[in-house]
């Protein structure tokens, strides 16, 4: 080994660089539904629901109409309809529920289920919604509107989305509202979105803490060896195994998120 140290050093350097380049392939993201593996019944059940029934994640908007009874305004319903259409055009969106959709269905039902009337009513929307609220059970009638009819809920069910994709989808919806209906804008919310933001902040904190640890280790080595050159040089053999391992993970797997063990 000593006799052939330079060829070995060159070969190991090339191998380390090639494997370490896989770090660039790592996607720092995760999926809440994949925190547990298939040994757990919860994971098997959620996989079945996602594959055969519906999505597991949802995004909600509580959109103010500007005052009591204003949810029946045509302009407001058009804004809801536009936001719903934007969501449906996004990949992975399974279902959108809003007062605009209910109004179109009620308008169609009023006209004998004629498909041509599956549209927002130009007039009489308030009376239409009032009839529905009076006839439907209280919990059903309040599923999309509040008691004063001043705010309505728009709900979105999405399929297999990662935390980053959920954040991106919600940010796009907020941007659409800010551009097209700022008077009715309300930020996207929801339990899935909350976990998506927690995931993003955890990843940011992990990267910052790793960089801070590297700086502190470098400073300690420089102080211990009393040489900036030797201190920085000594980082190479200490960091190389970690970089190679992460690079190999990047080439073979690609995703790096939260890992959950049996403990």
Name what the model sees in each region:
Residues 1, 5-263:
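Extracytoplasmic
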């Amino acid at each position: 080994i000593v006799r052939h140290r330079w060829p070995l050093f060159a070969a190991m350097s090339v191998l380390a660089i090639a494997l370490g380049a896989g770090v660039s392939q790592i996607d720092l993201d995760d999926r809440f539904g994949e925190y547990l593996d298939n040994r757990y019944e919860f994971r098997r059940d959620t996989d079945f629901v996602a594959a055969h029934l519906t999505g597991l994640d949802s995004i909600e908007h509580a959109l103010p109409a500007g005052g009591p009874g204003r949810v029946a305004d045509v302009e407001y319903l058009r804004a809801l309809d536009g936001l719903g259409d934007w969501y449906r055009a996004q990949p992975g969106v399974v279902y959108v529920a809003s007062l605009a959709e209910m109004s179109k269905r009620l308008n169609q039902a009023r006209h004998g289920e004629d498909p041509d009337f599956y549209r927002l009513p130009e007039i009489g929307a308030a009376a239409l919604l009032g009839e529905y609220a009076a006839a439907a059970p209280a919990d059903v009638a309040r599923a999309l509107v509040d008691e004063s009819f001043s705010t309505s809920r728009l709900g979105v069910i999405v399929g297999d989305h990662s935390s980053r994709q959920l954040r991106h989808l919600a940010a796009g919806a907020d941007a659409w509202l800010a551009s097209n209906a700022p008077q009715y804008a309300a930020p996207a919310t929801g339990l899935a979105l909350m976990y998506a933001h927690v995931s993003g902040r955890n990843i940011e904190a992990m990267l910052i803490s790793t960089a801070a640890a590297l700086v502190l280790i470098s400073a300690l080595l420089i102080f211990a060896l009393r040489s900036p050159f030797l201190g920085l040089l000594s980082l190479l053999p200490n960091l190389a195994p970690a970089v190679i391992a992460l690079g190999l993970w990047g080439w073979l797997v690609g995703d790096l998120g939260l890992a959950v063990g049996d403990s």
